[in-house]
Amino acid sequence: MHIHSDLSLPQFEHASIDPPSYSPQKSSFEEKKHNFSITNKSLETLRSQESPCSTTFPVSDRKDALLNIPTVVDDEFQHTEELAGVSSWSDFFYLFHFSDIPLIFGTLIFTCLSAALEPLMTWTTGKVFDALSQYATSQITLGKMISLINFNSLLITIFGLASCVFSFGVRFLWQYLSAIAGKRARSLCFHVLSSKSSTFYSLTESKSGLVNSVDRCIQFYEKSISLPMFHIAENLAISLSCLIISFRYSWSLTLVVLASYPIIILVVGFINSFLSSAYEKDRKSSEKAASILEKSISAIQTVIFHSMQDTEYRYFADACSTSSKSFLRFSFLDAFQGGVSQFFLYSVFFQGLWFGNHLATTKRVNVGQVVTVFGSCLSVASSLQQILPAIPDLIKGKFSSHFIKTLCESHDPIEAAKRSAAKIKSISFERGFRFDNVSFAYPSRDENLFSLINVSVFIPFGELVHIIGPSGSGKSTFISLLLRYFSPTYGNIYLDDFPLEEIDEHVLGSTITLVCQQPVIFDMTIRENIIMRNENASESDFEEVCRLALVDEFALTFDQSYDTPCKEASLSGGQQQRIALARALLRDTEILILDEPTSALDPITKNLVMDAIRAHRKGKTTLVITHDMSQINNDELVLVIDKGHLIQRCARKELVLFEDFENNVSIDEKVLKEEADNPFILPNEESLLEKYWINYNESFSQLSRESLFTSLESPFTDIESPTIVSRRKIVEQRKLRMEKESFQETNVDQTFHLFDDKEHACSLTLIFKSIWKVKKLRWFFLLGLLTSLIQGASVPIFAYVISKCLNLFMQIDPSIGVAFWSSMVLVVAAGSGASYFFSHYIFSISAKIWCDHYRLLAVKVLFTQDQAWFDQIENYPLVLSKILVNNISDMRNMISSLIEEVFIAFTMAIIGIAWSFATGWRLAAVLVAVSPILCLTSRMFSYIYVSTERMCQDVVISTTSILHKTIVNLDTIKGYSVLSFFRENHKNSLRKSWEAFKRRAFWTSLGFAINNSLLYFVRALLFYCSSIFISKEFYTVEQMVQVLSLATFTLLMASTCIMSLPNVSASRIATSRVLKLSSLKPGNLHKSGYLKFPLVGKIEFDGVSFAYPDSERNHLALNNVSLSIEAREKVAIVGISGSGKSTLVELLRKTYPSEDIYIDGYPLTNIDTNWLLKKVAIVDQKPHLLGSTILESLLYGVDRDINSVMDALDKTYMTEVIQNLPNGLDTPLLEFSKNFSGGQIQRLAFARALLRNPRLLILDECTSALDSKSSLLLEKTIQNLSCTVLIITHQPSLMKLADRIIVMDSGIVKESGSFDELMNRHTHFWKLIHRGEWIE
């Protein structure tokens, strides 16, 4: 039975359309809203006939419609300037709601109350200086002066108590607001990204890069609220309060002093306009660096095997270099802005001194008023100076919030159309689904390259339907459209006569289940993986699906049975497929789609699983994409798709009548037919099988736990008395174990810990040592310290100058010395501004050199680690990229901001105290006496910050990892309809992070409040002591004013140090983790060995036993394995899933160390690893194609000319596919090679292996994703190879190709011999290769 689909289009190769003209039939167009036929007519005209169908969009329009967020293309930043320029400060409040107004209002009230203490302090300080001035001019007595100073000291003590309350409140509330914004941002981004269509992600260069960028922006946004917004709001409130007091005492003097402040505002605004583009470029290049690192670490075995560590390192280094250049540009502008602003902030006292002197001379103000105005304006200057370092972080927060808003509000027309059209809430499943002239082109590919062309087919419900066709023919595209991952470019799909786009998403999700060819196993227990979102399933249902999918065969051998934690790397491919199948069978939806569901299973398991599916799914719709024709019964419906066309729809028995298909796809049947002629098979065997064959008319659920399958009797069973052996007994006999049983006690929402609880962030001493070790950095760092020393010295010098200026007002003639000291104000202001610029920029250069050195060193060391290191859960690729990319800004801050600030503050304090000692040692001694208390509390504060910050970073990594896994595996997760499960896990992780953030906010706010209030108490003590020292004539008034000014500035710098502690703690943690990675010792395997010799290819295993490093105790993946493979021999390694086959490969490629393995008689441990790997090639079952283009991926690790490349493509039959691509070999390779089918990826990996000209070729299920025709062609290539070939396979055709077969089971070599020798009922191989069947 044929379905006509315009078979007169043989020139359409791989669905590449050469458009002539098109003229649709009017009646057809009028009857259906979207019904086109693509023929040899103009595609241009066809595209002009756009249908009003809401779900159809021109291919060329989708990219702009879907991706209006910035992207990196060929190292060029697209739309960066434009995007950065349109951001506004309203974006900053995007994540706050109307209901947050009371909280925000309360936070601002507390901020104002906390800020009011500073002008009150200034007011009391003015009162103290006024009392000193009146006493110096004999206006009051000594007792009156002491009384006034003591009273004001008491006021300051009260202010200190109030500061403890207000500081705690304001600090806690700002961090609380930050936590709210971060929680909402993560929740919203998860919802938005998980709701995006597959079309959106097909146009996204990297899912991992996007997730990293989102995480980075959320961190910047959170940070900008918790610290910069807090600093800015508080200092603005302080400035406003001080201005009010200043205006209250002398409005004219205040206006004169502040006359140059508008210039500061203009300078800051002008320079900020250039900061945006620098930040955006830094963000985009960091995103690219994170993608490169994640991809490399995820495919680390491929990278190491091809000796491409240096190349991947250079790719990462180039991206980091771009990021660093943007960072330096940002730092230069920020330093220039800060230097100019600092000059104007200090120079205001130039005109203030002249005018104040004039007012004092004319008796319009008194000394106390002048001191109050100067003190208030100085507080304003100091507050604005503290705002300057916060501006860069605030700007990053602004543009990060704009990115989040842009991402969350980006219009996805595909999803919008689906939501608007989704009206159908129920389906009866009475008819079936229908494709009506459906054509489709992926939006990420060339518009003329259609994957499906004019597909029209009807499939009734309740059928088992097989979809077959060559690799890349459009089978998976067919399924993607049915799952509504994409919408048809032209045509319509109907489900039960309802347009697919009108069916509610939840209804569709509860109707269809997808099992992918490469199943996704999540970090949870086996039971949780299977029951996912089916918590109400009974235990009997769970056990039944485990039995049907044969999960119990390996799960019941574990101590914890189904509750054994697992991760993807711990399971063989077949075991992963069985878990995925059990998960799908438990859901038991009306429609089940299986994409090569048994490609990684051995023949016995494959047949048993397929038979179980047939029985369990009887009466329900099951679509199976397969290349294995032996799995299709004669009466089952088959759809044949080739080059985007539906070629045939018929029963299997009709299909095999065609010569092409008979020759191409029936090799497995031929193998089985040959078994009938084998003299070792008893003639009554088939009748015996039929006798116990299951009756499909009976309910499959009635199968008992003791169901059996045929022909698996013990090897010792007598040939004359064949018996049927219980499958449970076989499980008990075999005690099947996984090849890599390295299960971790973990869950999806687990928290990552790079440090254990006993480890701490590295000390500042260790950090300084790491700085000094970088020779290139030393001079920059020393120069930065020198300029910081100058800047730090400028503050006490300025304090000294101000004290001299204040002393002028206590003279009989205040005008004496005004010209000199006002000029000194300008000199000090200019020096301070210049030193600020040079110090900040030089330290930024130092930070760039330091961070780049250690993170590049860390990456270089990572590429030398053994596989056992990467198997550890804390070395997950996302964690490593977050440490080495996302958190690098915190490490930069260690030098560019924090060391600079701390050193400046330290310099100021030392100079201030030394100067105070020189001027009057007694008061300085009081300050020194209380400094241990300040140091102790600061130390405790720092410890609290480090511990709470590490806890918060761990939960953030955990939350981000869930987002990362969800987005990377989004199609699979949607296929299982378990997105709600991951949303719930994400919510649970957010709850944990929320609790962690609240704990951090409480304890750090308490520590900050205590430290801040101590400064008030110390100042009160200094004032109290000053009155006593003056009364005892230890000081003159002039000396006391100078010492108090210096001491006050010293306390101000101590306050600056305390304010920087949060950033210091975060930076110490980030720095510690980078330094820890950079200090790792290289692995032993990659550089091991020294022998080089003319490799022939003979392999020997001599009693090899091996257990994976993290496996259960006493569990051996290989147990006393002895085997020999001759040079140029083709040997097939066969066995059930988990028997140890892949472990042999791991040891041969020196992934793990092992003794007693020999190549050409030389011990493997003594052979030079890099030299050996160049002589070996491997084609994995799930190959990784690395490189930016197809050509780069083929030449990955080798240097060959184009002729060799084309020859390799010819041998793997990929030439035609490549030639039909718009850019040929220069076609970009998308993330996860998603622009190729699984079979095409395997063939490209095979071509890459051939280009290495190997002496030893290892094929690990290299044809599992190939159709039978492609597989047969590759087998011819393999047959003609002259090197040693090691074939791991479950395919009988590949086994027949081998000169010899080695059969493994449970890590033991059972037997070896040729195919014909092993095909008798006495052998383990016969049981393995023979069709297993369920019986009662």
Swiss-Prot record:
Q: Report the main location listed first in the record.
A: membrane
Indicate where this protein resides in the cell.
Answer: Membrane
**Cytoplasmic side stretches:** 1-91, 175-250, 800-897
Q: Per UniProt, what is the membrane topology?
A: Multi-pass membrane protein
Instruction: Kindly list the GO molecular function terms attached to this UniProt entry.
Output: ABC-type oligopeptide transporter activity; ATP binding; ATP hydrolysis activity; ATPase-coupled transmembrane transporter activity
Query: Which residues does the record list as glycosylated?
Result: 437, 454, 536, 664, 697, 1011, 1063, 1120, 1235, 1280
Q: What does this protein do?
A: Required in S.pombe M (minus) cells for production of M-factor pheromone. Involved in the transport of the farnesyl-derivation of the M-factor pheromone.
UniProt lists the family membership as follows:
Belongs to the ABC transporter superfamily. Alpha-factor sex pheromone exporter (TC 3.A.1.206) family.
**PANTHER family assigned to the protein according to its UniProt record, in alphabetical order:** ALPHA-FACTOR-TRANSPORTING ATPASE, ATP-DEPENDENT PERMEASE MDL1, MITOCHONDRIAL
Q: What is this protein called?
A: Mating factor M secretion protein mam1
Q: Which organism is it from?
A: Schizosaccharomyces pombe (strain 972 / ATCC 24843) (Fission yeast)
